[in-house]
């Protein structure tokens, strides 16, 4: 952080305290970890440029912001729904996007200077969300007429509400952007198109797989990983626990066999899932600055 910015923050925080004002900070980027501790897995498996980990401030910067007088900070830009707690005591609330897989926004209610409620409002119904679908259909038909493969799924135009449309949009973003740009070749080649039973057999040939593991494939697993990373608790209820248990079966198997480039990647994915599934409350919660804790409501 730049020293003159920290000095300015301290000046504002001191003035707020002197005038008995409640200070809430907003910034384009986060003031604390927003990846639920998953950066170590991301950097090891995918590199330092993935999942915006270069936007994760160092502990020294987070501590400096807190020491300057900021205890509650709202960040944007990353399209991530998350709550990060750092130091003694700074709460970083990442505000979700209105166009993410679970679109939404935050409402902050200040009960008193020490106690605040954060509510996350999700957008399921949006008036006229489909008003441009006719134009999208023309674009799709035009690409087909030219012999080009459309980059997005036509099923999106059958969406009954805005939430469903965003689901399709995010699935296509996963397919055409996230996987090609973020996922190492060994994963793209060996698990993306294999179903769950095949992935388990590839890792541990003697392991027993449930028949239902053939109902999903490696793409679905990566898609769920991206959904959890971006929407956190908001998407947790959309992923069946049975599916998560089957993912864990694969991750556990990877931890029992000899290391290889593929096995190391699967272990890393398991670590990321573990972090994203064990995050701080991020939907509706109370910030208690007096007790230095965040609790779900």
Q: Where in this protein do the model-derived segments appear?
A:
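Non-catalytic terminal accessory segments
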Residues: 38, 129-297
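Short, well-ordered beta-strand micro-motif
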Residues: 107-109
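Short, surface-exposed coil-to-beta transition loops
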Residues: 101-105
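Short strand-connecting beta-turns/loops that link adjacent beta-strands
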Residues: 87-88, 100, 112-115
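His/acidic metal-ligating clusters that form di-metal
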Residues: 1-91, 150, 176-189, 228
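Short, solvent-exposed aromatic-acidic interface loops
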Residues: 119-130
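Short, acidic/turn-prone active-site loops that include or flank metal/cofactor-
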Residues: 96-100, 123
